[in-house]
Amino acid sequence: MLGNLDPNLQLDVLNQMKNPKFVIMDTMNFWIEGYRTKLDEIISKVDLISVNEEEARQLTNSLSLIDSAKKLQAMGPKNVIIKKGEHGAILFSDKKIFQVPAFPLKKIFDPTGAGDSFIGGFAGSLSEKKQLSFQAMKTAAVTGSAIASYTVQQFGTKELENLTFRKLNKRIKEFKSLTNFEI
């Protein structure tokens, strides 16, 4: 997982990896504006890029998220996640699309860090899988959304610090029943 860091540092980290199985990267507007050439080089070398709606549009000059995802895939990564804040995220893989909603909450205390929690939960879930299938990525997206739902309930990482697998799995089951989809 190449976190939202200076693209030069991301490239240094990437170059230190020996035969990585699956590389995920995150970025932000500042790096897109100021380090575009280096950023494009990194994008071409990863398996999945995770961006929010604004970043996807900025990288591709397209208003359509589907078109943005296709353009990002053409840059190198076969998989794209576009985070949509309170509206969840969309996973694009080859010609498949999976939209995962945000977990419905009555109260949101602070959304700061929810996107980072989402991609961290996604990466953690995916790392436990024996295969990197679309089904595994769908499950990882649901896990990421469930983890992000805890992040927004408190300031900072307080809610995550007390999160257990039992609580997380309970939320995933509740999520599944609320949205009525198979994972």
Label for each model-derived stretch:
Residues 27-29, 104:
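Short, well-ordered turn and helix-capping elements at secondary-structure junctions
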Residues 10-23:
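Glycosyltransferases and closely related glycan-assembly transferases
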